[in-house]
From Swiss-Prot:
GO terms for cellular component: membrane. Disulfide bonds: none annotated. The keyword DNA-binding does not apply. It is found in: Membrane. Belongs to the tetraspanin (TM4SF) family. This is Tetraspanin-6. PANTHER family: TETRASPANIN, TETRASPANIN-6. Residues 1-19, 81-93, 230-245 are cytoplasmic. Residues 41-59, 115-208 are extracellular. It comes from Mus musculus. CDD domains: TM4SF2_6_like_LEL.
Length: 245
């Protein structure tokens, strides 16, 4: 058993570690809320783009929402473990932080590896959406209209892509291709945007996903601090047989 003097010397160290870990855990909890918000924002703001991507890509917002929720719950547990100054709970907290970090690392690697597949998938699906486009508006046709009107573009690579579609042969260009709102372009190429949507969509997705990736990377690195603090506090409590109830 540690001597009284040793325990008196250790008490300030444990108190300091406990205070720092509580501050960290609160910030960590906030990052969970941020990830949850980013996931919801991504689902809403990128919904039109995701509807033309493969199933793997559409899961990205749900992964962020799920991760944010787990972090919120884990942060609550970490706060409780720190307040209780429980060595085994702090070890469990550090273990969970490590698992989440590894999952985020694997997800980042997978996302980087399959980024070209996402681009190819979008281009292929967008081309098919143009071929099957109809004015009554299934979800893919609505997505095409939303993208073209929002990004002021027409077709995949340029407006000429529409000329090979059934819709063009029957009606002409869709209204979403118009340069000016409320026009009826029919087959008049002067009334529609010339630039295609593929490059613009990829630029938008890369920009938006860059924000998501940056936040996710920051959260992942931040977890390393928590792992270190939780481990140090747990070890200090165990080695010195000191427990605060």
């Amino acid at each position: 058993m540690a001597s009284p003097s040793r325990r008196l010397q250790t008490k300030p160290v444990i108190t300091c570690l406990k205070s720092v870990l509580l501050i960290y855990t609160f910030i960590f909890w906030i990052t969970g809320v941020i990830l949850l918000a980013v996931g919801i924002w991504g689902k809403v703001s990128l919904e039109n783009y995701f509807s033309l991507l493969n199933e793997k890509a559409t899961n990205v917002p749900f992964v962020l929402i799920g991760t944010g929720t787990v972090i919120i719950l884990l942060g609550t547990f970490g706060c409780f473990a720190t307040c209780r100054t429980s060595a085994w709970m702090l070890k469990l907290y550090a273990m969970f932080l490590t698992l989440i970090f590894l999952v985020e690392l694997v997800a980042a690697i997978v996302g980087f590896v399959f980024r070209h597949e996402i681009k190819n998938s979008f281009k292929s699906n967008y081309e098919n959406a143009l071929k099957e486009y109809n004015s009554t508006g299934d979800y893919r046709s609505e997505a095409v209209d939303k993208i073209q009107s929002t990004l002021h573009c027409c077709g995949v690579t340029n407006y000429g892509d529409w000329k090979g579609t059934n819709y063009y042969s029957e009606t002409g260009f869709p209204k979403s291709c118009c340069k000016l709102e409320g026009c009826y372009p029919q087959r008049d190429a002067d009334k529609v945007n010339e630039e295609g949507c593929f490059i613009k969509v990829m630029t938008t997705i890369e920009s938006e996903m860059g924000v998501v990736a940056g936040i996710s990377f920051g959260v992942a690195c931040f977890q390393l601090i928590g792992i270190f603090l939780a481990y140090c506090l747990s070890r200090a409590i165990t080695n010195n047989q000191y427990e605060i109830v």
